[in-house]
Amino acid sequence: TGVLHHMEEPLAGWRSLAGILRPGGVMNVALYSELGRREIPVIRAQYDSAADDVGIDGRVRQFRYNYLIDKMSDPSADRSGFGDFFTMSECRDQFFHIQEHRYAIPEIKKSLAELNLSFLGFDTQPTLRLSFEKNYPNPQDQLKLDKWWEYEQANPNAFGRMYNFWCRKPI
């Protein structure tokens, strides 16, 4: 496994994977959502200005401490929603990774076309799928990235912080 959204050139990595995919083969791809992670650059900026003498682990500890203090004083201030919050390495990766690319659905659509891959659908929670279907009852809309983009713009937290989807290489 690899992490495309942490590569210097994610499309180059994705192209390599698509290149070894057999005709008719399917691939599961996970990419950070620009809308879902919109608060991350703000958080990162607050802690990037911290003194360098504490290092990255010190910044992570300070971030987690401040978050928990905020949460105790205002329970509605839940900005995490991350299972990754409580381990040092996963919190560092989620909030402070030095290389991060975030995507919007139109970029995914463009990349799929460039790589000659067809979109097979998002791997989502049942509640998200049901909500989408209420707005877009035509079953074919599940495969239309433009419809998902409309939906996400109205529901910016729909995908959490990451898109997870399937695509196929044509036969």
Question: Where in the sequence are the language-model features?
Answer:
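A short SAM/SAH-binding and catalytic strip from SAM-dependent methyltransferases
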Residues: T1-L11, M27, S33
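Short, solvent-exposed loop/turn segments at secondary-structure junctions
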Residues: H5, E34-G36, Q125-R129
